[in-house]
């Protein structure tokens, strides 16, 4: 099985967790962040790590987007950077863009820009933990 490489933009806790899980499962991952220290620290968990400002369309184009089918935009805390990067990725024609949103409004804007999959990590994790807890409660009660 040949798995297409994935680009992860934003190597904070969410981005590096996602990227390292992908690489440990055999996926080639290009990690991108504007912070050189973060890129340096993340490099061991990635196939390739690059310092670049993804809000700059020219800088993003230099990363070889034509070869990338899947991008995860893991920048959530910086609304402007998230929106600019999402716009650049969509305009570049990336066929599968996932993006992290920190609020319903942020998610709505990302969808309006054309992002294919919007992820709300805290909301989604809260729901998942609630379902796990409910399963345990039902199992342990007579």
Regions found by a protein language model. Give the residues of each.
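Glycine-rich Rossmann-fold phosphate-binding loop(s) that bind the pyrophosphate
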Residues: 11-12
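Short beta-strand element of Class I
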Residues: 28-29, 97
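Aromatic pocket-lining residues of Rossmann-like dinucleotide-binding sites
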Residues: 22
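Phosphate-bearing ligand-interacting subdomains
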Residues: 40-133
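Conserved acidic E/D residue at the C-terminus of a beta-strand in Rossmann-like folds
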Residues: 33-34, 101
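N-terminal Rossmann-fold NAD(P) dinucleotide-binding loop
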Residues: 15
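Beta1/beta-strand and adjacent pyrophosphate-binding region of the FAD-binding site
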Residues: 4-8
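Residue-level detector of conserved catalytic or cofactor/ligand-binding positions
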Residues: 134-142
């Amino acid at each position: 099985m040949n798995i297409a490489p994935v680009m992860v933009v934003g190597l904070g806790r969410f981005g590096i967790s996602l990227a390292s899980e992908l690489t440990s499962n055999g996926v080639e991952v290009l990690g991108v962040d504007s912070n050189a220290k973060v890129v340096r620290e993340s490099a061991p968990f990635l196939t390739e790590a690059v310092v670049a400002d993804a809000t700059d369309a020219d800088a993003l184009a230099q990363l070889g987007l034509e070869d990338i089918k899947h991008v995860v935009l893991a920048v959530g805390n910086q609304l402007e950077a998230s929106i600019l990067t999402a716009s650049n990725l969509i305009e570049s024609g990336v066929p599968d863009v996932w993006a992290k949103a920190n609020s319903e409004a942020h998610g709505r804007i990302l969808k309006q820009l054309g992002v294919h999959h919007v992820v709300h990590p805290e909301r989604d994790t809260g729901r998942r933990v609630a379902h796990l807890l409910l399963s345990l409660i039902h199992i342990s009660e007579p």
